[in-house]
Amino acid sequence: MPRKNKYEAQLALINGENVNVGTKSELKDFVVLLGGLVGIVIIFLLSFNVVSDFFIDRMSTESQLKIESLFKGTQNKKIPDKYKQQIFLLENIKQKIIENDISIQGKSELNISVLEHKEINAMIKPDGSILFTTKLLDENFPEEELAFVLAHEIGHYSNKDHLKSISKQIAYAIICTIAGLDSKVNNIVQGVSEIEFLSHSKEKEKEADMYANKMLITIYGTNEGAKNFIKKLQNKDKLPEFVHYFSSHPSWNERLKLIENN
């Protein structure tokens, strides 16, 4: 068998057993690049959040109301007759909460309206209004339990979370725009951003729970409404505990322990 010259030997090296040498090098470079990209995204998000939260927390009432006015849409639909009594009750509870929190006095009217939805939920909108889903109202929770839900949403308003969530969306949009030229890079950025968002959101939910817990004790002298509401939803929730790791809210068990220990 004739001996291969050096060019044939190099070709055999490329096509033969040792071709994985270059693959290992490329894999190492990819891991380094990926780690650097993840690090940059995390640093950017943390820095952006710290800076934006700093200015939002110190925002004047006038500036806050101007920003909220930018998100005011069309007037909410008329409240159905079947929910009017509950909304009237919630409006009275709202006034008691405002009386006990100077930080929200003179700001949004915190208008309460009804949203047709099949899930038990409530939410604070960027304009400072609050939505209660029809499913939540259909459950006919007692006053103190409704008060906990309302106080939780007003807690978000007091902490200006409704504005901070906008800044998070802006940060995410900036990163996606920069990385948008490459779908693979964009997927990585999206994944890292969502993990950071979920972690940040869970902390905000705990703060809102603590606000609501304190408000119930102030108004009713007890936080039984908070504990009872959480227990009821905990019994309705059939998802395994670990699933809440991927949720924007802490698990019901975590929330109950937080309330019981404070």
Give residue spans per PLM region.
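A Zn2+-metalloprotease active-site environment signal
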Residues: P2-N262
